[in-house]
């Protein structure tokens, strides 16, 4: 979990340049980044709203931890 200062800085960057804020949190080649980039190109305000949502509420670490990895059976 990010500290409050780090979160405030990412939100401030997301207000100025939404894709950059999402890139700092989730990486540059992720679905969240491309969604934010498309929304910012379509309209600045939807890009800001999605960037703040992606920074504050989406936690990729919960989805890609060791215990939730899919199990593959080889027959």
From Swiss-Prot:
Species of origin: Arabidopsis thaliana
Q: What is its main location?
A: membrane
- Please give the family membership noted in the entry: Belongs to the UPF0057 (PMP3) family.
Top-rank taxon of the source lineage equals Eukaryota
Instruction: Work out whether the entry's keyword set contains Glycoprotein.
Output: no
Keywords of the record, alphabetical order, are:
Membrane, Transmembrane, Transmembrane helix
Q: How does it sit in the membrane?
A: Multi-pass membrane protein
Q: Where are the transmembrane segments?
A: 4-24, 33-53
- Pfam families, alphabetized: Pmp3
This one is known as UPF0057 membrane protein At2g24040
Q: Where in the cell is it found?
A: Membrane
Might you report a single GO cellular component term?
Answer: membrane
Determine if Nucleotide-binding is one of this entry's keywords: no
């Amino acid at each position: 979990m990010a500290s409050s200062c780090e979160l405030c800085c990412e939100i401030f960057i997301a207000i100025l340049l939404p894709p950059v804020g999402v890139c700092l949190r989730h990486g540059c080649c992720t679905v969240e980044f491309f969604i934010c980039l498309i929304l910012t190109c379509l309209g600045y305000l939807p890009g800001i709203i999605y960037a703040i949502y992606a920074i504050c509420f989406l936690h990729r670490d919960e989805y890609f931890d060791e215990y939730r990895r899919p199990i593959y059976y080889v027959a």
